[in-house]
Amino acid sequence: MAFQKAVKGTILVGGGALATVLGLSQFAHYRRKQMNLAYVKAADYISEPVNREPPSREAQLLTLQNTSEFDILVIGGGATGSGCALDAVTRGLKTALVERDDFSSGTSSRSTKLIHGGVRYLQKAIMKLDIEQYRMVKEALHERANLLEIAPHLSAPLPIVLPVYKWWQLPYYWVGIKLYDLVAGSNCLKSSYVLSKSRALEHFPMLQKDKLVGAIVYYDGQHNDARMNLAIALTAARYGAATANYMEVVSLLKKTDPQTGKVRVSGARCKDVLTGQEFDVRAKCVINATGPFTDSVRKMDDKDAAAICQPSAGVHIVMPGYYSPESMGLLDPATSDGRVIFFLPWQKMTIAGTTDTPTDVTPHPIPSEEDINFILNEVRNYLSCDVEVRRGDVLAAWSGIRPLVTDPKSADTQSISRNHVVDISESGLITIAGGKWTTYRSMAEDTINAAIKTHNLKAGPSRTVGLFLQGGKDWSPTLYIRLVQDYGLESEVAQHLAATYGDKAFEVAKMASVTGKRWPIVGVRLVSEFPYIEAEVKYGIKEYACTAVDMISRRTRLAFLNVQAAEEALPRIVELMGRELNWDDHKKQEQLETAKKFLYYEMGYKSRSEQLTDRSEISLLPSDIDRYKKRFHKFDADKKGFITIVDVQRVLESINVQMDENTLHEILNEVDLNKNGQVELNEFLQLMSAIQKGRVSGSRLAILMKTAEENLDRRVPIPVDRSCGGL
């Protein structure tokens, strides 16, 4: 009883405090709203993009080389860096951007895919009366509304259910979520509401039923993060920014200011990672927007600069779509160690995450088995015991590095800033660090404001509120129907193209190959179970894709959805890219191997493989072992103790099934632990044991052998009189 009173008191005090804050901030909020309206009007009157399509990478490199001096040079092609380039170029500043890898190759493509204000930050704002947290939530909610508006094809509101298992939590969480709606104000997506236990189970039938009291549903935004980042960069390029991926900054250029006598940063020495060519790019102002690599650029400027980035790894996993409703997510507000776990539908799959672990900065973060199992255990806690959560159902996993920062100007150097930090060095290098995906635009605005002030640049106000990103302006929810009717694409593919490219989907459809079937007329898929088509590979090159990794992870999202499917699609993707980019056989093989290494280490294939290669005792019942041995010996007719491609082909031919030899080789290679071109009986039994345990969700070889066995067993012996053996 005392505890319940304490909870009520906390709600009343916290709510009252926030109401006071809200009251005091109304005038400021009104002023900001008027300013934002002015910005939207400015965006309406902004000149059309100078380029109908983004210039080619080669054209961008020539611009970088031949421009005597830019106003702004941005280092980093993530969400914040691309946002800075777009903000600067739409103010009329001569802008350049360089990225040493691909756009969104780092943290910006490895997020939870949410556009949110941060419910947990609001909770802290109330409980600790923290005005900074409150302002951060309010800013994020405004930016959430803007992002959903300017890229409607890549983003949408998503209802998220918060299950409640204790009666006293229901009013506590309800007050918190209603305050979230209140802080959003006119930017509230949809009003939150309470569900009874029965209604909660109707919406989310896989929820843990025992002790469930009810649930609260609130709304946040969801997006395709890598494609959103790319849309920002492409929009900046269309407005005239010279943007180039695979351009590494090897050093900063400096010169002495004749008026002040101070040494100032005046550009960067850049290296084309693809060719090795180096040249200088000069600029009045250089912006460091490199996320987790913030300190490495700061130390180029000043080798004694104190580190401000405190990197933290966040791991996510992808599971089959049946683990969650198609259009509703779940929030676990208090995990076993106090963290928050999201469980969300995305691209017809289910994302679960995230973790929060201190880590070292690396361009190639690897998801750990420990973090994967932590997420799986938390998922088990919230799902019904009828749903068997298996390790083998993890189809992909990734780790993203959060660039948490300390403010170098703060007296307390140990405190981590929950908001972004704009730092200006003695030599004029501007660093933007911290923050989160949702607030990339306001971070960019603050950064360019600082650049204009520090370097006396002539520019107008920010014009990016209400400015449509590439593909968003003429998109509509029914656009995909025109793709079906005008081009003969199947509906699933058309919906995917519309949701990925927006009004640019027609250009992809024009490139689609004829299928040779009655229906669909065009649109050859890269893999049968996903709606990605070959035309996207060709179009992806127009979007600055330079490698096979770019294509499987950021132009399409195959690597983030299913690593096995991505590996299956790789040979065809490399073949198509090779034709467009004139790759020789050596280059194609190099691209194939690099992409497989990426899938193996960075996208969770390594952890998946280790579940299969675990040499622990085979745990199968004797009856199962006998059954699987019989299946194996139908292929191993010579009793060699192993099977090869020849054995599989022989059985398939006997049941009139044709299969490409390269595909067969890939299927056997998945199970061939010794990599000797043979699948031994012990390897096959390990595979079946791993499938039964749930370590591995399935295997193409296991499915193939089972299907072949069933076909062989269904054969009816031909009677003697039907075989001309009788009179």
Swiss-Prot record:
Give the protein's recorded name: Glycerol-3-phosphate dehydrogenase, mitochondrial
Q: Which GO terms describe its cellular component?
A: mitochondrion
An example GO biological process term is: NADH metabolic process
Q: Using the UniProt record, give the first listed, main subcellular location.
A: mitochondrion
| UniProt binding sites for Ca(2+) | D672, N674, N676, Q678, E683
This protein's gene is called: GPD2
- Pfam families from the UniProt entry: DAO (PF01266), DAO_C (PF16901), EF-hand_7 (PF13499)
Q: What is its EC number?
A: 1.1.5.3
Q: Which GO terms describe its molecular function?
A: calcium ion binding; glycerol-3-phosphate dehydrogenase (quinone) activity
